[in-house]
Amino acid sequence: HESGQYLFPGSGGVEEIGEGAGRGTALNVPLLPHTESDSYLAAFDRVVPHALAHFGPDVIVAQCGADAHYKDPLADLLLSSEAYETLFRQLLTLADKHTDGHILCTLGGGYHLDAVSRIWTVLALVVQDIDLPTSLPDDWRERWTAHIDEDLSPTLHDPEPSFNVKRRAAIAEQNKETSEQMLEQVTPHWH
């Protein structure tokens, strides 16, 4: 998630690791604004498989919000729809490995209607193992464009995003350090 230093409600720091018997069970990786897909996916890969291997859950409950998408007006993360597809596929693979395929995907978060509708459609298709279409129906796009006063994307995936993030390398390095710091905070509590 985006760092609470930049986004309401201001919580979710690496030091927030749970309390009492739950100490070490809250895992927060506060990412810097302008985190791009590669850095986000790297943080996911660094943390989530490790945590699932430790906790051995019976089921994965994944909140699949779309507010990390680069078009979202409230957050400052820069994920593409392709990154979301990668995350969804990785979650299914992890569910197969750790929970015998048991996963519950919930929806919530995301405030750009075109991006949200496409990302959640990608999720629905990936979960059902259905190939993603190369384009969206023109009549559907025309009908809904009239309701949201914005042109809808002709495809489920974004055009190749190109961001002019001047601190790209520094952001990626800080996100790497943050995810490693979080693991250093929680793993001593894992027995």
Task: For each feature predicted by the language model, list its residue ranges.
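A general "terminal functional-core" signal
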Residues: 1-191
